[in-house]
Amino acid sequence: MEPGSQQQPSAPGQQPPPVGHQIVHVRTDSETDLETLFNAVMNPKNANVPQTLPMRMRKLPDSFFKQPEPKSHSRHVDQTTTWQDPRKAMLSQINITAPTSPPVQQNIMTPTAMNQQRLSQSAPVKSPPALQPQSPPSGVLGSGGNQQMRLQQLQMEKERLRLKHQELLRQVRPQELALRSQIPPMEQDSGPPNPVCSSGISQELRTMTMNSSDPFLNSGTYHSRDESTDSGLSMSSYSVPRTPDDFLNSVDEMDTGEAITQSTIPTQQNRFPDYLETLPGTNVDLGTLEGEAMNVEGEELMPSLQEALSSDILNDMETVLAATKLDKESFLTWL
Protein backbone atom coordinates (compact mmCIF):
# COMPACT_ATOMS: atom_id res chain seq x y z
CA MET A 1 0.00 0.00 0.00
CA GLU A 2 1.29 3.44 -0.92
CA PRO A 3 -0.14 6.68 0.56
CA GLY A 4 -1.24 9.45 -1.73
CA SER A 5 -2.03 7.20 -4.73
CA GLN A 6 -5.22 6.73 -6.66
CA GLN A 7 -7.83 4.23 -5.50
CA GLN A 8 -8.83 1.39 -7.78
CA PRO A 9 -12.25 -0.25 -7.70
CA SER A 10 -12.17 -3.30 -5.46
CA ALA A 11 -13.89 -6.62 -5.88
CA PRO A 12 -17.45 -7.06 -4.51
CA GLY A 13 -16.35 -9.44 -1.73
CA GLN A 14 -13.46 -7.26 -0.47
CA GLN A 15 -13.48 -4.25 1.81
CA PRO A 16 -12.56 -0.96 0.18
CA PRO A 17 -9.06 0.33 1.05
CA PRO A 18 -8.70 3.30 3.38
CA VAL A 19 -8.96 6.78 1.96
CA GLY A 20 -5.68 7.84 0.35
CA HIS A 21 -4.41 4.27 -0.20
CA GLN A 22 -4.24 2.09 -3.27
CA ILE A 23 -4.02 -1.68 -3.66
CA VAL A 24 -2.13 -2.84 -6.74
CA HIS A 25 -2.69 -6.42 -7.97
CA VAL A 26 0.06 -7.63 -10.29
CA ARG A 27 -1.54 -10.34 -12.41
CA THR A 28 -1.13 -10.10 -16.18
CA ASP A 29 0.32 -6.77 -17.28
CA SER A 30 2.80 -6.04 -14.54
CA GLU A 31 4.60 -3.27 -16.39
CA THR A 32 1.46 -1.15 -16.71
CA ASP A 33 0.50 -1.62 -13.06
CA LEU A 34 3.99 -0.79 -11.84
CA GLU A 35 4.07 2.30 -14.02
CA THR A 36 0.73 3.39 -12.58
CA LEU A 37 2.03 2.90 -9.06
CA PHE A 38 5.21 4.80 -9.87
CA ASN A 39 3.27 7.74 -11.33
CA ALA A 40 0.92 7.81 -8.36
CA VAL A 41 3.79 7.96 -5.90
CA MET A 42 5.94 10.43 -7.83
CA ASN A 43 3.00 12.74 -8.68
CA PRO A 44 0.94 13.05 -5.50
CA LYS A 45 -0.78 16.21 -6.80
CA ASN A 46 -3.03 14.17 -9.05
CA ALA A 47 -4.07 11.89 -6.18
CA ASN A 48 -7.29 12.31 -4.24
CA VAL A 49 -6.07 13.73 -0.95
CA PRO A 50 -8.81 13.91 1.68
CA GLN A 51 -9.62 17.42 2.87
CA THR A 52 -9.08 18.51 6.45
CA LEU A 53 -12.16 18.07 8.61
CA PRO A 54 -13.22 20.80 11.03
CA MET A 55 -12.91 20.22 14.75
CA ARG A 56 -16.70 19.85 15.23
CA MET A 57 -16.87 17.01 12.71
CA ARG A 58 -14.03 15.01 14.17
CA LYS A 59 -14.52 12.24 16.67
CA LEU A 60 -13.43 14.03 19.82
CA PRO A 61 -14.55 13.38 23.41
CA ASP A 62 -17.24 15.61 24.92
CA SER A 63 -14.83 16.93 27.53
CA PHE A 64 -12.84 18.57 24.76
CA PHE A 65 -15.66 21.06 24.11
CA LYS A 66 -16.49 21.74 27.79
CA GLN A 67 -14.88 24.15 30.17
CA PRO A 68 -12.55 22.47 32.68
CA GLU A 69 -13.67 22.03 36.24
CA PRO A 70 -12.34 24.44 38.91
CA LYS A 71 -10.04 21.80 40.38
CA SER A 72 -8.54 21.05 36.97
CA HIS A 73 -7.14 24.51 36.32
CA SER A 74 -3.36 24.95 36.24
CA ARG A 75 -3.68 28.16 38.26
CA HIS A 76 -5.90 27.56 41.25
CA VAL A 77 -5.89 31.16 42.46
CA ASP A 78 -7.54 32.77 39.45
CA GLN A 79 -8.87 29.47 38.02
CA THR A 80 -7.30 29.92 34.59
CA THR A 81 -5.55 27.50 32.28
CA THR A 82 -3.29 28.84 29.53
CA TRP A 83 -0.76 27.22 27.25
CA GLN A 84 1.95 29.05 25.37
CA ASP A 85 4.13 27.75 22.59
CA PRO A 86 7.75 27.51 23.91
CA ARG A 87 9.03 28.36 20.44
CA LYS A 88 7.64 31.87 20.79
CA ALA A 89 9.84 32.54 23.82
CA MET A 90 12.91 31.27 21.96
CA LEU A 91 12.18 33.50 18.98
CA SER A 92 11.65 36.51 21.23
CA GLN A 93 14.97 35.89 22.98
CA ILE A 94 16.78 35.69 19.65
CA ASN A 95 15.17 38.91 18.48
CA ILE A 96 16.14 40.68 21.71
CA THR A 97 19.75 39.52 21.82
CA ALA A 98 20.45 40.17 18.12
CA PRO A 99 20.46 44.02 18.27
CA THR A 100 22.05 44.16 21.72
CA SER A 101 25.07 41.96 20.91
CA PRO A 102 27.17 44.65 19.07
CA PRO A 103 27.01 47.16 21.97
CA VAL A 104 28.08 44.44 24.39
CA GLN A 105 31.11 43.61 22.28
CA GLN A 106 31.97 47.28 21.95
CA ASN A 107 31.73 47.75 25.71
CA ILE A 108 33.98 44.78 26.34
CA MET A 109 36.76 46.13 24.13
CA THR A 110 36.91 49.45 25.98
CA PRO A 111 40.17 50.33 27.82
CA THR A 112 38.37 50.17 31.18
CA ALA A 113 37.48 46.52 30.69
CA MET A 114 41.01 45.74 29.51
CA ASN A 115 42.47 47.36 32.64
CA GLN A 116 40.08 45.43 34.85
CA GLN A 117 41.13 42.16 33.24
CA ARG A 118 44.82 42.96 33.69
CA LEU A 119 44.25 43.84 37.34
CA SER A 120 42.32 40.62 37.89
CA GLN A 121 45.18 38.60 36.36
CA SER A 122 47.92 40.35 38.33
CA ALA A 123 46.00 40.34 41.64
CA PRO A 124 43.49 37.46 41.94
CA VAL A 125 42.14 38.94 45.21
CA LYS A 126 40.61 41.86 43.27
CA SER A 127 38.62 39.61 40.94
CA PRO A 128 35.24 39.89 42.80
CA PRO A 129 35.05 43.70 42.40
CA ALA A 130 35.91 43.36 38.72
CA LEU A 131 33.10 40.86 38.20
CA GLN A 132 30.46 42.91 39.99
CA PRO A 133 29.20 44.64 36.82
CA GLN A 134 28.44 41.19 35.40
CA SER A 135 25.76 40.49 38.02
CA PRO A 136 22.26 41.13 36.62
CA PRO A 137 20.20 44.01 38.02
CA SER A 138 17.61 43.15 40.61
CA GLY A 139 14.79 44.51 38.51
CA VAL A 140 15.58 42.47 35.38
CA LEU A 141 13.83 39.08 35.63
CA GLY A 142 12.93 38.40 32.02
CA SER A 143 14.48 35.80 29.78
CA GLY A 144 15.98 38.48 27.55
CA GLY A 145 17.99 39.92 30.45
CA ASN A 146 19.29 36.47 31.44
CA GLN A 147 20.33 35.74 27.88
CA GLN A 148 22.13 39.06 27.61
CA MET A 149 23.93 38.48 30.91
CA ARG A 150 25.00 35.01 29.79
CA LEU A 151 26.32 36.37 26.50
CA GLN A 152 28.25 39.08 28.35
CA GLN A 153 29.80 36.52 30.69
CA LEU A 154 30.88 34.38 27.75
CA GLN A 155 32.45 37.35 26.01
CA MET A 156 34.33 38.38 29.16
CA GLU A 157 35.55 34.82 29.70
CA LYS A 158 36.74 34.63 26.11
CA GLU A 159 38.62 37.92 26.45
CA ARG A 160 40.19 36.79 29.74
CA LEU A 161 41.41 33.54 28.18
CA ARG A 162 42.87 35.42 25.23
CA LEU A 163 44.79 37.78 27.50
CA LYS A 164 46.03 34.87 29.59
CA HIS A 165 47.22 33.10 26.46
CA GLN A 166 49.13 36.18 25.33
CA GLU A 167 50.73 36.51 28.76
CA LEU A 168 51.86 32.88 28.67
CA LEU A 169 53.34 33.39 25.21
CA ARG A 170 55.30 36.41 26.44
CA GLN A 171 56.66 34.36 29.34
CA VAL A 172 57.62 31.37 27.20
CA ARG A 173 59.29 33.34 24.39
CA PRO A 174 62.45 34.38 26.39
CA GLN A 175 62.91 30.81 27.60
CA GLU A 176 62.64 29.50 24.07
CA LEU A 177 65.18 32.03 22.79
CA ALA A 178 67.55 31.14 25.63
CA LEU A 179 67.29 27.44 24.80
CA ARG A 180 67.92 28.10 21.12
CA SER A 181 70.99 30.16 21.96
CA GLN A 182 72.35 27.31 24.07
CA ILE A 183 71.80 24.57 21.49
CA PRO A 184 74.79 25.38 19.14
CA PRO A 185 77.41 25.29 21.95
CA MET A 186 75.90 22.06 23.24
CA GLU A 187 76.14 20.51 19.80
CA GLN A 188 79.75 21.60 19.51
CA ASP A 189 80.59 20.27 22.98
CA SER A 190 78.83 16.98 22.36
CA GLY A 191 80.51 16.37 19.02
CA PRO A 192 82.15 13.03 18.32
CA PRO A 193 85.66 12.70 19.76
CA ASN A 194 88.61 12.34 17.48
CA PRO A 195 89.67 8.76 16.87
CA VAL A 196 92.74 7.58 18.76
CA CYS A 197 95.57 7.40 16.29
CA SER A 198 98.33 4.86 16.55
CA SER A 199 101.90 5.86 17.36
CA GLY A 200 102.93 5.27 13.74
CA ILE A 201 100.74 8.10 12.37
CA SER A 202 102.51 11.42 12.32
CA GLN A 203 101.16 14.74 13.58
CA GLU A 204 101.07 16.17 10.05
CA LEU A 205 98.68 13.45 8.88
CA ARG A 206 96.30 14.14 11.76
CA THR A 207 96.40 17.88 10.99
CA MET A 208 95.57 17.25 7.33
CA THR A 209 92.67 15.01 8.31
CA MET A 210 91.16 17.53 10.72
CA ASN A 211 91.66 20.56 8.46
CA SER A 212 90.54 18.90 5.25
CA SER A 213 87.95 20.67 3.17
CA ASP A 214 86.23 17.42 2.21
CA PRO A 215 82.88 17.30 4.08
CA PHE A 216 82.88 13.50 4.07
CA LEU A 217 86.12 13.16 6.04
CA ASN A 218 84.85 14.79 9.23
CA SER A 219 81.31 13.43 9.05
CA GLY A 220 81.85 10.48 11.41
CA THR A 221 84.13 9.07 14.04
CA TYR A 222 86.03 6.94 11.54
CA HIS A 223 85.85 6.02 7.89
CA SER A 224 83.82 3.05 6.78
CA ARG A 225 84.85 0.91 3.85
CA ASP A 226 82.47 1.30 0.92
CA GLU A 227 81.73 -1.29 -1.69
CA SER A 228 83.67 -0.93 -4.94
CA THR A 229 81.96 -1.48 -8.27
CA ASP A 230 84.98 -1.75 -10.55
CA SER A 231 87.69 -3.51 -8.53
CA GLY A 232 85.79 -6.73 -7.85
CA LEU A 233 85.99 -6.30 -4.06
CA SER A 234 82.84 -6.55 -1.95
CA MET A 235 82.07 -5.58 1.63
CA SER A 236 82.83 -9.02 3.08
CA SER A 237 86.05 -9.75 4.97
CA TYR A 238 86.95 -12.64 2.64
CA SER A 239 87.17 -10.53 -0.50
CA VAL A 240 90.92 -9.80 -0.21
CA PRO A 241 92.86 -12.35 -2.31
CA ARG A 242 95.32 -14.51 -0.44
CA THR A 243 98.24 -16.63 -1.44
CA PRO A 244 97.23 -20.32 -1.30
CA ASP A 245 98.74 -22.39 1.50
CA ASP A 246 99.88 -25.08 -0.96
CA PHE A 247 102.05 -22.57 -2.76
CA LEU A 248 103.77 -21.49 0.47
CA ASN A 249 104.40 -25.09 1.51
CA SER A 250 105.97 -25.91 -1.85
CA VAL A 251 108.24 -22.89 -1.64
CA ASP A 252 109.39 -23.85 1.86
CA GLU A 253 110.35 -27.33 0.66
CA MET A 254 112.66 -25.98 -2.08
CA ASP A 255 116.39 -26.40 -1.73
CA THR A 256 117.70 -22.82 -1.77
CA GLY A 257 120.92 -23.55 0.04
CA GLU A 258 119.72 -21.92 3.30
CA ALA A 259 118.68 -23.77 6.42
CA ILE A 260 115.16 -22.40 6.93
CA THR A 261 113.13 -24.53 9.30
CA GLN A 262 109.38 -25.03 9.19
CA SER A 263 108.93 -23.61 12.66
CA THR A 264 109.76 -20.04 11.66
CA ILE A 265 106.59 -19.38 9.71
CA PRO A 266 104.07 -20.44 12.38
CA THR A 267 105.96 -18.47 15.04
CA GLN A 268 105.69 -15.34 12.92
CA GLN A 269 101.99 -15.89 12.37
CA ASN A 270 101.38 -16.57 16.03
CA ARG A 271 102.83 -13.21 16.99
CA PHE A 272 99.61 -11.51 15.82
CA PRO A 273 96.36 -11.97 17.81
CA ASP A 274 93.62 -14.15 16.38
CA TYR A 275 90.93 -11.48 16.62
CA LEU A 276 92.52 -9.60 13.71
CA GLU A 277 91.16 -12.28 11.39
CA THR A 278 87.57 -11.32 12.31
CA LEU A 279 87.96 -7.62 11.51
CA PRO A 280 86.91 -6.46 8.01
CA GLY A 281 89.83 -5.75 5.71
CA THR A 282 92.43 -7.46 7.94
CA ASN A 283 92.19 -10.97 6.54
CA VAL A 284 95.76 -10.73 5.25
CA ASP A 285 98.74 -12.88 6.08
CA LEU A 286 100.44 -10.31 8.30
CA GLY A 287 103.36 -12.63 8.99
CA THR A 288 104.76 -11.98 5.54
CA LEU A 289 104.71 -8.19 5.89
CA GLU A 290 107.26 -7.62 8.60
CA GLY A 291 109.21 -9.64 11.09
CA GLU A 292 112.58 -10.58 12.40
CA ALA A 293 113.10 -13.14 9.65
CA MET A 294 112.61 -10.45 6.99
CA ASN A 295 115.18 -8.21 8.65
CA VAL A 296 117.67 -11.05 9.00
CA GLU A 297 117.26 -12.08 5.38
CA GLY A 298 117.65 -8.50 4.24
CA GLU A 299 120.86 -8.06 6.22
CA GLU A 300 122.25 -11.31 4.83
CA LEU A 301 121.39 -10.42 1.23
CA MET A 302 122.81 -6.92 1.26
CA PRO A 303 126.53 -7.90 1.05
CA SER A 304 125.83 -10.73 -1.40
CA LEU A 305 124.14 -8.51 -3.97
CA GLN A 306 127.41 -6.86 -4.89
CA GLU A 307 129.03 -10.21 -5.71
CA ALA A 308 128.68 -12.01 -9.02
CA LEU A 309 126.06 -14.70 -9.31
CA SER A 310 127.52 -18.18 -9.04
CA SER A 311 126.61 -21.09 -11.25
CA ASP A 312 125.08 -22.96 -8.30
CA ILE A 313 122.49 -20.24 -7.79
CA LEU A 314 121.62 -20.22 -11.49
CA ASN A 315 121.22 -23.99 -11.51
CA ASP A 316 118.97 -23.83 -8.46
CA MET A 317 116.81 -21.15 -10.10
CA GLU A 318 116.41 -23.24 -13.26
CA THR A 319 115.35 -26.18 -11.12
CA VAL A 320 112.78 -24.08 -9.31
CA LEU A 321 111.39 -22.63 -12.54
CA ALA A 322 111.14 -26.07 -14.10
CA ALA A 323 109.26 -27.41 -11.09
CA THR A 324 106.99 -24.38 -11.17
CA LYS A 325 106.05 -25.00 -14.81
CA LEU A 326 105.16 -28.62 -14.07
CA ASP A 327 103.07 -28.03 -10.94
CA LYS A 328 101.54 -24.64 -11.66
CA GLU A 329 98.14 -26.21 -12.30
CA SER A 330 98.00 -27.58 -8.76
CA PHE A 331 98.84 -24.60 -6.57
CA LEU A 332 98.41 -21.41 -8.65
CA THR A 333 95.08 -19.59 -8.57
CA TRP A 334 94.49 -17.11 -11.37
CA LEU A 335 92.42 -14.06 -10.39
Swiss-Prot record:
Region of interest (Transactivation domain), ranges: 137-335
Domain of life of the source: Eukaryota
Subcellular location: Cytoplasm; Nucleus; Cell junction, Tight junction; Cell membrane
Ranges for region Disordered: 1-21, 114-146
GO CC aspect terms: bicellular tight junction; cell-cell junction; cytoplasm; nucleus; plasma membrane
Coiled-coil annotated residue ranges, if any: 145-173
Role summary: Transcriptional regulator which can act both as a coactivator and a corepressor and is the critical downstream regulatory target in the Hippo signaling pathway that plays a pivotal role in organ size control and tumor suppression by restricting proliferation and promoting apoptosis. Plays a key role in tissue tension and 3D tissue shape by regulating cortical actomyosin network formation.
Family listed: Belongs to the YAP1 family.
Protein's UniProt name: Transcriptional coactivator YAP1-B
Organism: Xenopus laevis
